[in-house]
Amino acid sequence: MLRLDSSDDKQHLVIRSAGGRGKAAEYSFGIEEEYFLADRRSLDVAIQTPNELFESANWSTGGQAMREMLQSQLEVATNVHVDVNDAREELRFLRREVANVAAQYGFVIMACGTHPTAVWRMSQPSPKPRYEEMIEDLRSIGHRNMMCGMHVHVQLPDPEKRMAVMRAMLPHLPLFIALSASSPFWNSHKTGLKGYRLAAYSELPRTGLPELFESRHDYDEYVGALQRSGVIPDESHIWWAMRPSMKHPTLELRAPDTCTFVDDAVAIASLYRCLTRHLYRRPHLSKTVTVVERAIAVENKWRAQRYGTDCIFASKDGPITISELLSRLIDDIVEDADALNCAAEVEHCRTIVERGSSAEFQLRAYRENGNDIAAVSRWIAASTISGRALRSDAPRLRRHSARASFGNDNGIPEFAVSRAVSWRKA
């Protein structure tokens, strides 16, 4: 069991074992995934969803499933983990549990950045005061927020070094966007982008890449100004691609699309975790990120959205392929991957580049089925539950493939009752 506690110097929050016998391993992490709820027969996105579904899902997962801003969305959050294999197994468990509950109400879950055929104008806010207030403020832009992302929290106790890591991490954010791209369709149209989600998400205020804050004080001053001006109630309304958590001693990656494959989600989370460790131990690297590097990162964010795993990034030295960029990064963090026992997961990022992210599979399903967008939805629904790529290329799909993939395995893995802390809505 894990719990939040104070550090030995009483200056920071840390994760400790429930027995109090010392800190858990540094750089513990958690993963949040958002899913679409869709009609089990038509795979059209759900418009209205009953509270009982979410109550059942919350109970079934031990409190790890909840509503999101729109009724068509459901979010799960893992517990805090120090072992990457535990995190993988919990994600699989959470998908199985919420899928089984959703099926009882006539729905399936779909893990992707955008639903291929969803019509945002029909979206309805979830019946919670927080979300109703957000829709009242955001209006049409809030209704257009029909998209799903993956968030990764990594524990970094020192708030000053946490801000240094956020700044140093900024040039790397486009890589996470490219690796996770799973949103090539919007409103039944092929967008031409591999990751359309962030293009739509950028309509919201306080999104995109973080600013170049020099210190935690500067960040707090910015947040305080918005709060005193009545712009935001708290810093959870800052929706950058990465942000410090409001409630926990973590730095939260928010850039990725929800991954269709569990192994891809765990690989991207592991890459981020290793890089945070690397940068946390070298806070001076934040000073190398200037306005020029940020401007290049903004361009590369667009390129990652447009091209996904086919991306060629811009750099001061000229173009660099995603394969070369990833290889350099893996070389830099090899010590960190060994220390965190996730070298295999980091290496899986190379597999994502070689065979493509979910966006490539979706586009293949579309082409191989005569440009039938319904085939894309069937592929996503089936692959969400299997959680893995069944072949190196997207299979030809039949109408029954999603339905045939739903199992009845309700086994609860040991970790589901052996963790006590999770990072949600922070």
Swiss-Prot record:
GO terms for molecular function: ATP binding; glutamate-cysteine ligase activity; ligase activity, forming carbon-nitrogen bonds. InterPro entries: GCL_type2/YbdK_subfam, GCS2, Gln_synth/guanido_kin_cat_dom, YbdK. GO terms for biological process: modified amino acid biosynthetic process. It catalyses: L-cysteine + L-glutamate + ATP = gamma-L-glutamyl-L-cysteine + ADP + phosphate + H(+). It comes from the Bacteria. Its EC number is 6.3.2.2. Keywords: ATP-binding, Ligase, Nucleotide-binding. Pfam families: GCS2. HAMAP family: Glu_cys_ligase_2. Belongs to the glutamate--cysteine ligase type 2 family. YbdK subfamily. ATP-dependent carboxylate-amine ligase which exhibits weak glutamate--cysteine ligase activity. This is Putative glutamate--cysteine ligase 2.
